[in-house]
Every structure is written in structure tokens, then in C-alpha cells.
């Protein structure tokens, strides 16, 4: 960050507590850029702001051009009103808080109280003074403070807004390649997620026949996420029957019926805030019907084809193209396409998108859709590098009202999703130990439910 923005002040807020209802807040979760730069996870630290102050070249931290200071609200003494009366930050209400020295020791950063933040952000701001770059729309108070100072100082507001957008873009791009520690945390997230899938299989008999069986599934996975991680990485999709044809079905209010398929898309967020993102489609009764197996195998073949080409040097977009070639071939073989496979795969065709409308892959890390602000040429058109982690998740979705497919296909949705690490000479499927083939899934479910 220092090398990218020499001579400029960089302001990265963690964010504020968000109200769920009246005086009840959501559990705090810091902005991913803040977590990435500070190494803080779990619920650290509401209202905190990381400020990188420019220095003379080489005079900053570790020979960089900036010094970094973490501003936050530290432990309040028992002789303060805050300790007893502040339900958001008082230790009597929420438990112990870190001291300035404690968080400095933990992060290796300078620390200071929030009372010093305004001066740190606003000093020397002028049209010809210190330029400030802000991770905007993260903390409304910081946004308002800097907007007022920029206006008063005569700073070009359009140029400042563009600089802020570039900063968010760059901070997102920083996460495209994971280091060894990040990969280790993602392995832990994947392991906890796999344990959660096993919990769901054990809970399936209890879900069957319940009016809200999908909630039984959701609850079983959530318990594991809170037991082994910080939280869910995203709202669990527990979609049975026709609900599996709804890409982001998170109401999970449906029943789970014998003979249906259950699409479970879920991930545990580690205490470090790195998350897994895995999907399996399971036969509720423990065995696939012939048509379910046929559709599932087509999706599995597409996923395997995409994985087979993963290696450094190929472009990210090639994964989707490879998976689509397989799915289009299967759809054509089933007689579902109104045109040839060649026409369907053309830019003008895309007829298969009726049944597979989403992308095959997305980056994964601190956000389930990580690096989302990265430039197109580094993401979709980007070249794969060792250390990148992303999903491969093709699917087929045949809605129950879709008269363009045979009746026995209707109401079936299948998605298979794994978390993939690019290595020096290929790739590793981080979630490969979770059964993937129809036979493996049937045997796995039988063993867990025995």
C-alpha cells in the first residue's frame, strides 16, 4: 500500500456497528480491507481506523514511506461512565476490551485513542497539501469528516472521489494472491465446513417431514459454524426440491421431502474472517434416482473439466468456458437445446443460460466473493497465479414450471462447488475430501446415518 500511494495519507476504517432493530445491533464484522491490513478478526474493532501517514522516502515502518497507526476505543477504567453506562462499548455490558498496549503488541502497529483520530485524518489537508485517500462508505462519520475538510480546503471533490475509488480497487486487488498463512486459515475454514456438512447429513432424518425442514438443515450447519469458527461466511442456502432451482434461496422455509434433492451451499468463517464456500447436492432419501444421477453427473463432469485445466498462466475466464462446453454437450445430448451446441456456445447464442445462468468461479478469501472491486483485467480477464483461491461451481437448474424440459427433470437443481488453490504447477482442491461422485455421496450418507 505504501509503495502504491507514496506521499499520500491512507485512511482505512473498520466500520461501525449496524442496527438490526431499535437498540439491538448486528454482531460486528470489520471491513475486509481493514481485517487484511491489520490481521484483526472476530469482532475487532468497531469504529477503529487504520491511518497510514506519509513520511520521507524510506523513513517509515520497515523502510517504507509510511507509518501506520491504529486508532480505536480502548479499555475504559472502572471509574468511568463508559464502563457502566455504554451498552455498545462498556466492559460491564460487552466484556473486556483491549488496551492500547495490548492491541499494539498483538498487531505490531502503533495504537492511539479515537480522540486523536480527527487530527490524524485532517491535518495539513489542502488543495496543495497532504492528499488523503479514504476507503469510503465504510464509516459514515469518517466520510462526513473528510468531506467537510476537503470542501473547506478547496480540494477537487471529483478527483478525490476517483482517488477513493482507486484505493478500494487496489485494496481489493491486494487479496488476489494469498500467502501461506492465509491459505492455512482457509484450510481451517474448509475443514470446519466439511464437519458442518457431516452434521447436516446426520440431521437429515430429523428434517424430513418437518414443515420447515430446511431450517433444521440450516440450524445444524450454523451450530458448527459458531462452534468452530467466527460465524457463517454468508447466509446458508438449504434448498430442497424446487427451491434448489433458486440460486440464492436463503429463506429456508421449505419442507425436506423423501425423493428430493437437497442443495446445501454453506461456508464457515474462521476467526480470522477467512471463509470457505462449498456446495453439495444430496439425495434426501440417501440414493439418487436415475434422472437425478444423470443431471448430477453432468454437473460433476463440468466441474472436473474446469479443474483439470487450472494451472498458473491460464486466464480466469477459461474456467467458465471449459465448464460450459461440457454442460452444453450434455444439454445437446438430452435434446434440450433449440440450436446446435456450437451456436449455443457462441456469444450470440448462450441458450444454455436458461439452465445455467451464473459464472462458474469467483475468488474466495475474507469475502465469500473476494476481490470484487478488482479491475476486470486482473479478475475476469486475469491470469492465474500460485496462491490464488477461488471456487469452481457449475450447476443446472430445471424449474418445476419449465415446459421446455421433460417432466422428470422439473424441480431439480444441482450445483457442485469446491474451493481451489492454484499451486506452482497446477491446482489443489481444498475441499476434495468431501464426497463428490454419486456413489461416494450415497456411501457417505449411509455411513453417517447408520
Residue ranges and their predicted role:
Residues 1-450:
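Active-site neighborhoods and metal-handling regions in enzymes and metal-associated proteins
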Amino acid at each position: 500500500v505504501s509503495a502504491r500511494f507514496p506521499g499520500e495519507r491512507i485512511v482505512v476504517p473498520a466500520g461501525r456497528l449496524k442496527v438490526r432493530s431499535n437498540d439491538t445491533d448486528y454482531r460486528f464484522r470489520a471491513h475486509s480491507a481493514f481485517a487484511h491490513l491489520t490481521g484483526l478478526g472476530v469482532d475487532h474493532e468497531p469504529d477503529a481506523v487504520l491511518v497510514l501517514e506519509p513520511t520521507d522516502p524510506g523513513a517509515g515502518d520497515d523502510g517504507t514511506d509510511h507509518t501506520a497507526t491504529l486508532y480505536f476505543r480502548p479499555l475504559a477504567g472502572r471509574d468511568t461512565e463508559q464502563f457502566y453506562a455504554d451498552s455498545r462499548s462498556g466492559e460491564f455490558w460487552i466484556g473486556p476490551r483491549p488496551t492500547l498496549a495490548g492491541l499494539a503488541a498483538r498487531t505490531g502497529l502503533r495504537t492511539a485513542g479515537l480522540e486523536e483520530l480527527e487530527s490524524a485524518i485532517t491535518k495539513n489537508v489542502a488543495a496543495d497539501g497532504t492528499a488523503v485517500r479514504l476507503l469510503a462508505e465504510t464509516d459514515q462519520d469518517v466520510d462526513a469528516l473528510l468531506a467537510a475538510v476537503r470542501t473547506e480546503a478547496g480540494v477537487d471533490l471529483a478527483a478525490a472521489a476517483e482517488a477513493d475509488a482507486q484505493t478500494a480497487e487496489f485494496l481489493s486487488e491486494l487479496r488476489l494472491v494469498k500467502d501461506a498463512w492465509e491459505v492455512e486459515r482457509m484450510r481451517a475454514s474448509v475443514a470446519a465446513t466439511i464437519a458442518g456438512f457431516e452434521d447436516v447429513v446426520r440431521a437429515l432424518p430429523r428434517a424430513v417431514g418437518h414443515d420447515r425442514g430446511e431450517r433444521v438443515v440450516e440450524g445444524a450447519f450454523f451450530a458448527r459454524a459458531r462452534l468452530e469458527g467466527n460465524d457463517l461466511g454468508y447466509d446458508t442456502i438449504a434448498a430442497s426440491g424446487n427451491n434448489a432451482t433458486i440460486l440464492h434461496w436463503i429463506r429456508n422455509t421449505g419442507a425436506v421431502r423423501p425423493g428430493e434433492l437437497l442443495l446445501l451451499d454453506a461456508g464457515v468463517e474462521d476467526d480470522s474472517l477467512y471463509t470457505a464456500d462449498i456446495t453439495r447436492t444430496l439425495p434426501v432419501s440417501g440414493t439418487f434416482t436415475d434422472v437425478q444421477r444423470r443431471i448430477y453427473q453432468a454437473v460433476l463432469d463440468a466441474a472436473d473439466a474446469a479443474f483439470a485445466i487450472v494451472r498458473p498462466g491460464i486466464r480466469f475466464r477459461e474456467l467458465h468456458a471449459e465448464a460450459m462446453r461440457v454442460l452444453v454437450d450434455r444439454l445437446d445430448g438430452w435434446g434440450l437445446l433449440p440450436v446446435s451446441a456450437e451456436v449455443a456456445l457462441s456469444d450470440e447464442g448462450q441458450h444454455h443460460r436458461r439452465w445455467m445462468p451464473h459464472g462458474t468461479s469467483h475468488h474466495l478469501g475474507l469475502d465469500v466473493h473476494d476481490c470484487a472491486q478488482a479491475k476486470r483485467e486482473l479478475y475476469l480477464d486475469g491470469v492465474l497465479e500460485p496462491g490464488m483461491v477461488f471456487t469452481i461451481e457449475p450447476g443446472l437448474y430445471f424449474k418445476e414450471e419449465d415446459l421446455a424440459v421433460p417432466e422428470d427433470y422439473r424441480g431439480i437443481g444441482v450445483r457442485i462447488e469446491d474451493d481451489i488453490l492454484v499451486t506452482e504447477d497446477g491446482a489443489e482442491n481444498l475441499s476434495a475430501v468431501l464426497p463428490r461422485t454419486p456413489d461416494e455421496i450415497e456411501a457417505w450418507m449411509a455411513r453417517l446415518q447408520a
